[in-house]
Curated annotation (Swiss-Prot):
Similarity comment: Belongs to the ATPase A chain family.
One GO MF term: proton-transporting ATP synthase activity, rotational mechanism
Localisation: Plastid, Chloroplast thylakoid membrane
Protein name: ATP synthase subunit a, chloroplastic
Organism expressing this protein natively: Nymphaea alba (White water-lily)
Assembly: F-type ATPases have 2 components, CF(1) - the catalytic core - and CF(0) - the membrane proton channel. CF(1) has five subunits: alpha(3), beta(3), gamma(1), delta(1), epsilon(1). CF(0) has four main subunits: a, b, b' and c.
Keyword Kinase in record: no
Length: 248
C-alpha cells in the first residue's frame, strides 16, 4: 500500500497552504511617504482595461450598433435602470456616472483576480491580486459613497437634512448618527471579505487538488464577484436615494 507517499503528499499540501501569505505588501517610497504599490499597479491595469475597451467599442459610433457598441449600450442601460430604481426617476440622472463608475471598476477588479495571471509578475514583497482584495481599495470606494449621500441630502434639503437624525424621536439620535457612519464600514468590509475569501479558497483548493475541484469554484467565484459589484452599486444608489427622500 502507498500509505506513506500519500501521507507525504498530504503534508506537502498542508505545508503549501500554510505558506499562503495574506497582508504582505510592496511599497514605493515617494518623498517621505510609503505608497502601496500593489493596489496602484492593479488599479491602473483595471482602469486601462475599462478605458481601452470603451474607446475601442465607441470610437466610431454607428446608427446600427456594432457588437461592442451594442454591449456598452446594454451596460449603460443596465446601470441607468439600477440608478432609476434606487434613486428615483426624477433624481437619478446626475448620479448615473458615479454609480456606473463604481459598478464597472468593482466588476472588472473582481474578475481580474480570477482571469488575469497576476502571479506571473514577481515583486520583492507580496504578490499582485485583484484591487478589491485589499481593504485600502474597498475603503477608498466606500468613503466617496458616504460623501455622495451626504452631498445629495444637503443639496436637496439643505440643513434640514440633519433633521432626519431626530426622527421619529430625538431619543434615536445616537442610533441614527451611528447608522450613517457605519454604512461605509459595511460596504468596504463586505466587498473586501468576499473577494479575499474567494481568492484564498481557490489558492487552498489548487494546492490540494490542482486539476479538477478548483475549476467550478473559480466559475462560482466569477458569479459571486459580479454579484458583489452589483450589491455595492445598488446599495450606494439606495443610500443616495434615501438621503434625498429623508425616510427609511
Amino acid at each position: 500500500m502507498n500509505v506513506l507517499p500519500c501521507s507525504i503528499n498530504t503534508l506537502k499540501g498542508l505545508y503549501e497552504i500554510s505558506g499562503v501569505e495574506v497582508g504582505q505588501h510592496f511599497y514605493w517610497q515617494i518623498g517621505g511617504f510609503q505608497v502601496h504599490a500593489q493596489v496602484l499597479i492593479t488599479s491602473w491595469v483595471v482602469i486601462a482595461i475599462l478605458l481601452g475597451s470603451a474607446a475601442i467599442a465607441v470610437r466610431n459610433p454607428q446608427t446600427i450598433p456594432t457588437d461592442g457598441q451594442n454591449f456598452f449600450e446594454y451596460v449603460l442601460e443596465f446601470i441607468r435602470d439600477v440608478s432609476k430604481t434606487q434613486i428615483g426617476e426624477e433624481e437619478y440622472g446626475p448620479w448615473v456616472p458615479f454609480i456606473g463608475t463604481l459598478f464597472l471598476f468593482i466588476f472588472v477588479s473582481n474578475w481580474s483576480g480570477a482571469l488575469l495571471p497576476w502571479r506571473i509578475i514577481q515583486l520583492p514583497h507580496g504578490e499582485l491580486a485583484a484591487p478589491t482584495n485589499d481593504i485600502n481599495t474597498t475603503v477608498a470606494l466606500a468613503l466617496p459613497t458616504s460623501v455622495a449621500y451626504f452631498y445629495a441630502g444637503l443639496t436637496k434639503k439643505g440643513l434640514g437634512y440633519f433633521g432626519k437624525y431626530i426622527q421619529p424621536t430625538p431619543i434615536l439620535l445616537p442610533i441614527n448618527v451611528l447608522e450613517d457612519f457605519t454604512k461605509p464600514l459595511s460596504l468596504s468590509f463586505r466587498l473586501f471579505g468576499n473577494i479575499l475569501a474567494d481568492e484564498l479558497v481557490v489558492v487552498v483548493l489548487v494546492s490540494l487538488v490542482p486539476l479538477v475541484i478548483p475549476i467550478p469554484v473559480m466559475f462560482l467565484g466569477l458569479f459571486t464577484s459580479g454579484i458583489q459589484a452589483l450589491i455595492f452599486a445598488t446599495l450606494a444608489a439606495a443610500y443616495i436615494g434615501e438621503s434625498m427622500e429623508g425616510h427609511h
